[in-house]
């Protein structure tokens, strides 16, 4: 999830939940298009894995004759195999040990050699195993969900259909109805073309994915508040129009990952990213467009139940001498654009999150107080969107929601856009800074 200008065990996680006064949650069930924001949009629950995609084929049994001489044909009976329902990935990993991400050495050789040989550091890292397993479980869910998305999303689908496909898959793989235990880490980003981030459809949105669109797919998965944040860009144009910007952004992201590490200054990471990104140009209709870093979008560190936790990882040289530290978690993401390289808020808002440390703020009305309790019970400080509120049964909530925003209790995150007619792309991974090495926990075969 775009950012703009830990060794805890289960008891600590539960205490964080209790601090929010959380009871059992209620049943869980822009571009230019706008929705009404108050309807109920339910997603299908029959998602299946890619390997099950052929299970819908109709099987026709052959007709047989009923007597010698007469050839009476029986009506063919078409039988459909039932789709295989996605089940929690816990069934695949009964011991609770999930696949590790990609391990990488730290860039600073003197620090790296010390940490690799330090038994004490490695011992301390093992003591945080529950934390790492939460991240690895979330990452494995993320890989399976995006595999489903990449094999299923096609032009002609509505944004609602795409969002439901992804989000229902996250819910099913997580296998937990308590949204604060495991599930969606933040609203699914499906930003098109000049829209760089923070677009997800509201109920009633009729926007349809077109063949010439370039779509950023930003998916968040959390387990016990440990959030995996990873994004990729999809295109369907067959003439290779977007190949250059895709390559620029992907390479810039991998450069940021390579340069990240304990004691590395944030400015140095941004400078390395910028050098790679801005070495590319994109051609369209005989014109050449330089690929620019979107300078007011950043990567960010992640804390439990908090997607943007204070430190920002720039994608340009910005003079920030703050260092990354051992044990921190970062989302390394880069955005490239053929436009101004600067984004502004525009369009109907869908993304929201309750701010931290707002316990002393009093909701201005009884309705906003009741809505705030729904938010606490179901999301805590995790980001959410209007559709998620509606799954809890909330209706006619917009006035109360806007009250919470005006009083600083809830933060709104509207879509952010570059100039119209430009194209933007994004790639992102979550990295864990272990004492001896870094782990690109969300890395997969796809990106």
From Swiss-Prot:
Residue numbers binding a divalent metal cation 1: 218, 229, 428
EC number: 3.4.11.18
Residues annotated for substrate binding in this entry: 198, 308
GO biological process, one term: proteolysis
Positions of region (Disordered): 1-86
Binding residues annotated for a divalent metal cation 2, in chain numbering: 229, 300, 333, 428
Cofactor(s), by name: Co(2+); Zn(2+); Mn(2+); Fe(2+)
Enzyme class: hydrolase
Protein name in the entry: Methionine aminopeptidase 2
Organism: Candida albicans (strain WO-1) (Yeast)
């Amino acid at each position: 999830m775009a950012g703009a200008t830990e060794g805890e065990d289960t008891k600590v996680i539960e205490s964080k939940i209790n601090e929010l006064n959380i009871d059992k949650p209620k049943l869980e069930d822009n571009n230019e298009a706008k929705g009404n924001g108050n309807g109920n949009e339910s997603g299908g629950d029959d998602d299946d894995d890619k390997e099950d995609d052929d299970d819908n084929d109709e099987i026709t049994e052959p007709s047989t004759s009923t007597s010698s001489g007469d050839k009476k044909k029986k009506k063919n009976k078409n039988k459909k195999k039932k789709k295989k329902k996605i089940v929690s990935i816990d069934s695949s990993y009964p011991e609770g040990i999930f696949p590790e991400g990609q391990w990488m050495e730290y860039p600073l050789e003197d620090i790296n050699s010390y940490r690799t040989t330090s038994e004490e550091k490695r011992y301390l890292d093992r003591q945080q195993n529950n934390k790492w397993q939460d991240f690895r479980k979330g990452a494995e869910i993320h890989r399976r969900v995006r595999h489903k998305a990449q094999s299923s999303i096609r032009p002609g689908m509505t944004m609602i259909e795409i969002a439901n496909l992804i989000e229902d898959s996250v819910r099913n793989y997580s296998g937990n109805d308590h949204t604060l235990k495991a599930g969606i880490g933040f609203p699914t980003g499906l930003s098109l073309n000049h829209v760089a981030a923070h677009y997800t459809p509201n109920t009633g949105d009729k926007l349809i994915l077109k063949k010439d669109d370039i779509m950023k797919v930003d998916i968040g998965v959390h387990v016990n508040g440990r959030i995996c944040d990873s994004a990729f860009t999809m295109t369907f144009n067959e003439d290779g129009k977007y190949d250059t910007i895709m390559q620029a952004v992907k390479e810039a992201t991998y450069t940021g990952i390579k340069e990240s590490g304990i004691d590395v200054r944030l400015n140095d990471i941004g400078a390395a990213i910028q050098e790679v990104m801005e070495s590319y140009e994109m051609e369209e209709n005989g014109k050449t467009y330089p690929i620019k870093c979107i300078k007011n979008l950043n990567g960010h560190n992640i804390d439990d139940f908090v997607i943007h936790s204070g430190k920002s990882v720039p994608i340009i040289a910005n003079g920030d001498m703050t260092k990354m530290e051992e044990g921190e978690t970062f989302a390394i993401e880069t955005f490239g654009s053929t436009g101004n390289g600067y984004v502004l808020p525009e369009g109907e808002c869908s993304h929201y999150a309750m701010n931290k440390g707002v316990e002393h703020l009093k909701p201005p009305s009884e309705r906003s107080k009741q809505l705030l309790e729904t938010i606490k019970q179901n999301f805590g400080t995790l980001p959410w969107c209007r559709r998620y509120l509606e799954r809890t049964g909330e209706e006619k909530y917009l006035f109360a929601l806007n009250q919470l925003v005006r009083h600083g209790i809830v933060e709104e995150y509207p879509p952010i856009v570059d100039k119209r007619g430009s194209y933007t792309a994004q790639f992102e991974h979550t990295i864990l800074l272990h004492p001896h090495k870094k782990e690109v926990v969300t890395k997969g075969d796809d990106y």
